[in-house]
Amino acid sequence: MMLRFRSFSTTTHLLRGQNLTEKIVQKYAVGLQPSSKKVYSGDYVTIKPAHCMSHDNSWPVATKFMNLGASKVKDNRQIVCTLDHDVQNKSEQNLTKYTNIEKFAKSQGIDFYPAGRGIGHQIMIEEGYAFPLNLTVASDSHSNTYGGIGALGTPIVRTDAASIWATGQTWWQIPPVAKVELIGQLPKGVTGKDIIVALCGIFNNDEVLNHAIEFVGDDAISKLPIDYRLTIANMTTEWGALSGLFPVDETLVEFYQNRLKKLNKPDHPRINNQTIDQLINNKLTSDNDAVYAKHLQIDLSSLSPYISGPNSVKISNSLYDLSQQNIAINKAYLVSCTNSRLSDIQAAADIIKGHKVNPNVEFYVAAASSLVQKDAEQSGAWQTILDAGAKPLPAGCGPCIGLGTGLLKDGEVGISATNRNFKGRMGSKDALAYLASPEVVAASAVLGKIGGPEELNGEPVKQAPRIIKSIETESNSANEAESTSEEASGSIDILPGFPQSIEGELILCNADNINTDGIYPGKYTYQDDITKEQMAKVCMENYDSQFYSKTKPGDIIISGYNFGTGSSREQAATCILARGMKLIVAGSFGNIFSRNSINNALLTLEIPDLINKLRQQYEGNDELTIRTGWFLKWDVTKAQVTVVDGDDNLILTQKVGELGTNLQDIIVKGGLEGWVKSELKTNQ
């Protein structure tokens, strides 16, 4: 069983309010016991999201859906299919996949958007599927984008999507929520892209890893255009967060009023006078006594244009610093769901007008959607960019995901308005990729080097001021909330077949970022005939070849931070189960690994204090796998963990997130697929 519980939160938080993330989840949580129960960070909930989007991966989701025994989607109004990733690929194989997706969607009555209509996330916003204060998910990591319009958007994996198709529901553990406060006024020439690139670079020690983010600061945010907010929310994914939520304010309401006028469809099913009136009259805000895991602050007035890279979002430098280095570029890109909306294209056109793309540079442009391109054509911005020498691509992901025309080759340098510059992401692993705003990308395309718009007029880039920032963690209010809830905590109901407690000796794997290949070597991933016993023997093999001989069934692995980072292979969870281990503890877990855990019924706990104590205990010990002689007991009925040493001396007592009976049911059924099959059978 793999189920993940974070220790940052409490269980029966009867005496405090909710933050905005918790309030939105409350609206979409089902099966709460009692129905009036409030939900908080750390709690597992069953959610029925407003909408669920899948893109080119819709066919694998459909295949999984059918393999579950499902034949009809639960609610075809909940599901959206878009084709956006590999739209330049005209191979028979890809066209067949696209045809299969379209046929399936139409047979189910699902809203379907074909290749060329645009990037799924942009469509979700244009067509109102992602709407302020709703919960919208997608089988894509950039679902965070929806936070820019005040929707709680978060990614899911394919099994989750298949579950939603079949039952309308999946599970979510509410993450710790980080408050990111924006103060000050953004200087002229500084954009939303500069804000998020700076945040990724200055808070680059996983401060918000696997957190939900709420952006606050009414004065500063009110002056940020919605397109800036969408860019910022989009790249909270690269910052490590699971969502990036902006508040509902007058700027957002005005955005939707203008959108309604542009649609010219009074009876639009999602964006209409009624939904906008509801938005105005029913604004949700965080309670004054809501608890946040962290409070980060950045003064926007101290920002200047910033650039990410090369090849890492954790590296950011001011435009001033990089412009001094005369870094020649080969390719420039104005594409993606991050920065290819109308305002982005217009901004690039304003910079490039009257200039020509440098003869040593290839400049590629693709609109975020066909509607955006149409608007850009009507405004003249699209033609301005093409007249300068840019090469148009169809509306879609393209180079951002490393597909189609214009990829980086060995030794090349590219600057892009996209969201990811991981090595090899946009082409060759031997290329260098930088991320910047549309304005800087356009200027660089003309200059032939990384540079700013002012250089086109013969002026130097202004020197960057020092960024003013701060961070607070584990506030007193959070600690007080935990102690209060401890006193108020009652007994949690336990379903037949689910253990009331789990206990075992802690086995220390003292490393951070143990990836899925370290847990389950890739060379075994596609050996479909491998037995459970063989899986057990190779569990953690690439991390420590002696792991099997040092461990036994019933042990509990405890590891460092970001355990399970890497690929989406489910065997990283199932091989641990094969070793006879029901629970893993870590400082934190990779998000995909976490979802695969629950979906395969393995339990996990995030307890940073415990791994830190063990690291102090075994400082200087270089063994990879250590039997600690410390024993953990997790009392599920009280949502409490106790750790003692071999002499029964108390090491730690800590509250963890509550596991309700709805999530217990998933575990008892052997994971999410087993639960879905049971639901389908019950409802036949």
Swiss-Prot record:
Q: CDD domains in the record, alphabetically?
A: Homoaconitase, Homoaconitase_Swivel
Class of the enzyme per the UniProt entry, highest EC level = lyase
The protein's superkingdom reads: Eukaryota
Name the pathway.
Amino-acid biosynthesis; L-lysine biosynthesis via AAA pathway; L-alpha-aminoadipate from 2-oxoglutarate: step 3/5
What's the short name of a Pfam family annotated to this entry? Aconitase
Spell out the protein name for this chain: Homoaconitase, mitochondrial
Enumerate the GO terms in the molecular function aspect: 4 iron, 4 sulfur cluster binding; homoaconitate hydratase activity; metal ion binding
UniProt remark on cofactor binding: Binds 1 [4Fe-4S] cluster per subunit.
Q: Which Gene Ontology biological process is one annotated for this entry?
A: lysine biosynthetic process via aminoadipic acid
- What cofactors does the UniProt entry give for this protein? [4Fe-4S] cluster
Where does the chain bind [4Fe-4S] cluster?
C337, C397, C400
- The EC number(s) this enzyme carries: 4.2.1.36
Which reaction is recorded as catalysed by this protein?
A: (2R,3S)-homoisocitrate = cis-homoaconitate + H2O
Report the protein's function. Catalyzes the reversible hydration of cis-homoaconitate to (2R,3S)-homoisocitrate, a step in the alpha-aminoadipate pathway for lysine biosynthesis.
Q: Which key words tag this protein in UniProt?
A: Amino-acid biosynthesis, Iron, Iron-sulfur, Lyase, Lysine biosynthesis, Metal-binding, Mitochondrion, Transit peptide
This entry carries the following GO cellular component terms, namely:
mitochondrial matrix
User: Which protein family is named in the record?
Assistant: Belongs to the aconitase/IPM isomerase family.
Q: What is the annotated localization of this protein? A: Mitochondrion
